[in-house]
């Protein structure tokens, strides 16, 4: 499982000119699922993301977690995180999870995030989406459960 986390001051996702998810301070998550991902991978990332201390405290040090700053999450599915560009100029997406499995895992991931008490907004799995954000910092962190 791969997640690109961006600390944002605001973010939104639009489908067919309608905003379907929107947050102010928090994390924009671009979420990629592969067929090897398990519920343990979800649990690992939920714990890491919910406890990640990348918000500034009163001393200006990145020391506060999302819940401590009343932040929210905008979670957007993104199979292109599993693009392979080893051959040619057209990416291959064969490492991305099969749609039914990936959607099930993506939905479960978002439910588990919400169960931590953090407000979670989402895009729509498989849709053509426009994502707008203001990256705060910038702070961008890559997670890959194959590396843990």
Swiss-Prot record:
One of its GO terms (biological process) is D-amino acid catabolic process. One of its GO terms (cellular component) is cytoplasm. A motif (Gly-cisPro motif, important for rejection of L-amino acids) lies at residues 137-138. One of its GO terms (molecular function) is tRNA binding. It holds the Pfam family Tyr_Deacylase. Keywords: Cytoplasm, Hydrolase, RNA-binding, tRNA-binding. Its EC number is 3.1.1.96. InterPro entries: Daa-tRNA_deacyls_DTD (IPR003732), DTD-like_sf (IPR023509). The keyword Cytoplasm applies. SUPFAM superfamilies: DTD-like (SSF69500). It catalyses: glycyl-tRNA(Ala) + H2O = tRNA(Ala) + glycine + H(+); a D-aminoacyl-tRNA + H2O = a tRNA + a D-alpha-amino acid + H(+). Its main location: cytoplasm. The keyword Cytoplasm applies. It is found in: Cytoplasm. It is an enzyme of class 3 (hydrolase). Homodimer. A Gly-cisPro motif from one monomer fits into the active site of the other monomer to allow specific chiral rejection of L-amino acids. Belongs to the DTD family. This is D-aminoacyl-tRNA deacylase. It comes from Latilactobacillus sakei subsp. sakei (strain 23K). The lineage of its organism: Bacteria, Bacillati, Bacillota, Bacilli, Lactobacillales.
């Amino acid at each position: 499982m791969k997640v690109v986390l961006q600390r944002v001051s605001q973010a939104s996702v639009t489908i067919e000119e309608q905003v379907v998810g929107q947050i102010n301070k928090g994390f924009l998550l671009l979420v990629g699922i592969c067929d090897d991902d398990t519920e343990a991978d979800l649990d690992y990332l939920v714990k890491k993301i919910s406890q990640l201390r990348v918000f500034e405290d009163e001393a200006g040090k990145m020391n506060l977690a999302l819940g401590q700053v009343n932040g929210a999450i905008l979670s957007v599915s993104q199979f292109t995180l599993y693009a392979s560009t080893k051959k040619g100029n057209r990416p291959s997406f064969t490492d991305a999870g099969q749609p039914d499995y990936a959607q099930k895992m993506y939905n479960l991931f978002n439910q588990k995030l919400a169960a931590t008490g953090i407000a979670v907004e989402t895009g729509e799995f498989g849709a053509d989406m426009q994502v707008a954000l203001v990256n705060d910092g910038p702070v961008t962190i890559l997670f890959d459960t194959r590396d843990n």
